[in-house]
């Protein structure tokens, strides 16, 4: 068979369930470097679109790389359509974005994509910062999230700090965090999963709160003391996998949290500074 036929017969195009748009590292387990293997462990196909490409996270003594140029980034997205690789697409997830212009490019691509995929699940992890570090992305990214991605998302997964930035509301107690999350809900944005709500410090618990228009569910997990990076990226990968495998939202959140705890403990047992995925036991 000629190479011309092999690479131009679109009926042969590789298909994916998920397009994951976020950071990638050469060394380490953050962004798509942890999300892609986690999604594949769940038996789903995924295309990874990088927003930044780094040697490793900046927490090490040295790191190299940076944001993907807009021309490349838009080309990566466009190529998936040119290859006719999105016929079976079910979800798009976003994580760490390198620039506000990437967010705008992505939003334009998603808007066009939804015309052919009206049931597409768009899940946004609005990576902005955290309480300990403050904002650790470019200062124009929060407004870009508000303007371009939140209006397209069906679900978002902010931590408490990110929820405060997106809403401009104080969220340091559970009731105020829930109220802030509800203020973001719309005809499009159906749910908010708050990934670091106030937990019980004495009982070493942390809480994840699932907020929708008609329900609020608080899920408590054991708190694991760790400096491991990429746990939020892993959580989102597990969450989207659970949803696509037919789990209800709250159940998918609960299972995702348990999987993250399992991975963290497994990693600690192996004395690694980077997350290690153990085999996935099918529940």
From Swiss-Prot:
Keywords on record: ATP-binding, Kinase, Magnesium, Metal-binding, Nucleotide-binding, Transferase, Zinc
Highest rank taxon of the organism: Bacteria
EC number(s) per entry: 2.7.1.35
GO terms, molecular function: ATP binding; hydroxymethylpyrimidine kinase activity; magnesium ion binding; pyridoxal kinase activity; zinc ion binding
Top EC class for this record: transferase
Binding of substrate, residues: 23, 59, 233
SUPFAM superfamilies with a match to the protein in the record: Ribokinase-like (SSF53613)
Pfam short name (any one): Phos_pyr_kin
Binding site for ATP: 125, 157, 162, 195, 221-224, 231
Residues annotated as transmembrane: none
Pathway: Cofactor metabolism; pyridoxal 5'-phosphate salvage; pyridoxal 5'-phosphate from pyridoxal: step 1/1; Cofactor metabolism; pyridoxal 5'-phosphate salvage; pyridoxine 5'-phosphate from pyridoxine: step 1/1; Cofactor metabolism; pyridoxal 5'-phosphate salvage; pyridoxamine 5'-phosphate from pyridoxamine: step 1/1
BP GO terms, sorted: pyridoxal 5'-phosphate salvage
Function of the protein: B6-vitamer kinase involved in the salvage pathway of pyridoxal 5'-phosphate (PLP). Catalyzes the phosphorylation of pyridoxine (PN), pyridoxal (PL), and pyridoxamine (PM), forming their respective 5'-phosphorylated esters, i.e. PNP, PLP and PMP.
Subunit structure as annotated in this protein's UniProt entry: Homodimer.
Similarity comment: Belongs to the pyridoxine kinase family. PdxK subfamily.
Official protein name in the record: Pyridoxine/pyridoxal/pyridoxamine kinase
Organism: Escherichia coli O1:K1 / APEC
Gene: pdxK
């Amino acid at each position: 068979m000629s190479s011309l036929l092999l690479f131009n017969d679109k009926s042969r195009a590789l298909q994916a369930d998920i397009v994951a748009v976020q950071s990638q590292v050469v060394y380490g387990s953050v962004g798509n470097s942890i999300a892609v293997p986690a999604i594949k462990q769940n038996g789903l196909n995924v295309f990874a679109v990088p927003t930044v490409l780094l040697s490793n996270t900046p927490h090490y003594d040295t790191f190299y790389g940076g944001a993907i140029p807009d021309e490349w980034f838009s080309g990566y997205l466009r190529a998936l359509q040119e290859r006719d690789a999105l016929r079976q697409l079910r979800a798009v997830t976003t994580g760490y974005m390198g620039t506000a212009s990437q967010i705008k490019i992505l939003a334009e691509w998603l808007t066009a994509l939804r015309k052919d995929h009206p049931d597409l699940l768009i899940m946004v992890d609005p990576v902005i910062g955290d309480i300990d570090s403050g904002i650790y992305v470019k200062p124009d990214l929060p407004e870009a999230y508000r303007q371009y991605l939140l209006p397209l998302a069906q679900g978002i997964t902010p931590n408490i700090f990110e929820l405060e930035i997106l809403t401009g509301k104080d969220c340091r107690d559970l009731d105020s965090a829930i109220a802030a999350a509800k203020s973001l809900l719309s005809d499009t944005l159906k749910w908010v999963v708050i990934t670091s709500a106030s937990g019980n410090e004495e009982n070493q618990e942390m809480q994840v709160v699932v907020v929708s228009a008609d329900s609020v569910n608080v899920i408590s997990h054991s708190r694991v003391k760790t400096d491991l990076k990429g746990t939020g990226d892993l959580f989102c990968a597990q969450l989207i996998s659970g949803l696509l495998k037919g789990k209800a939202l709250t159940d998918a959140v609960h299972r995702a949290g348990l999987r993250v705890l399992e991975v963290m403990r497994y990693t600690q047992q192996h004395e690694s500074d980077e997350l290690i995925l153990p085999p996935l036991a099918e529940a």
